[in-house]
Amino acid sequence: MKYTSLFAAACFAAISLQTDQSFAQDADEPVSQCLAIAQTMPKVIFASLDANPLDLKGDVTITYAGHSTYRIESPQGVVAATDFSGIYGTEPTMPRIVTMNRAHSSHHTLSPDPAIEYVLAGWNDMSTGPIDHDLVVDDVYVRNVATDIRSFGDGMIADGNSIFIFETAGLCIGHLGHLHHALTDDHFAQIGRLDILMVPVDGGLTLSHQAMADLTRRLRSSIVLPMHLRGNSISSFISRMGPDWDSIFLKGNTITVSVNSLPKQPTIMVPRSLGRSGGFSDF
């Protein structure tokens, strides 16, 4: 297991940082396919001996596991699980990569399974400033954009959450995490293009449905996958997206998608188990 951050605060036990440099490469660094303007990317941690691991072909399988956890499986079989707490996302196989956020215990774990190779925390306990992830594992590139979270008292905790972006098979897949504020132009520039967006739709613990809908419309992703549902709030979020967005309730919890199969009209796709928890059973 390789850790890229420490949990060390009053509420969090420390986990030691381990970085296996045996896989580090000085070869060409990957360039994000999601950024509109090419920039020099920061140094990345390679987890593959392939000097040019990013492939633009193949299908990506995305499965809703529960709460805020989606499993993303690349064409080469690399599995990443989002906002991983250890409760969801471990079946049928343990993911190689997990991302976590610190807002609540349902979004992280202090004791990830040792079989997980890469544990990416969305916050930085080692120093001031945002955590910065740039990780390549075979055909998957993972990076993050830091945002703030509300503290348990007044005010905000700077850089306490991360939007994680997964690039594989030419697709740009973003997970907003436990987002607590509107995004700035700088955030949008760092995020770039997102073909698939995983968005919290609780309507209160993160952002209001209106604020989340406004943000989602600006990102203009081809597929929107809801998560972090409370009560019947999915219908409230969908209604605020407006007529330019289609919505479908999936027959299962899994979609398979490629660059060529993205819908022409932006579409909200509600996984079966999420829809059922939101009071929709006739599908």
Label for each model-derived stretch:
Residues 5, 18-148, 173-176, 195, ...:
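Metallo-beta-lactamase
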Residues 148-219, 230-236, 240:
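Active-site-proximal loop/helix segments of hydrolase catalytic cores
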Residues 8-10, 168:
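Residue-level detector of transmembrane insertion/anchoring sites
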Residues 227:
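A Lys-centered signature of the CheY-like receiver
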Residues 1-8:
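Bacterial N-terminal signal peptides that target proteins for export
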Residues 10-12, 22:
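Cleavable N-terminal signal peptides
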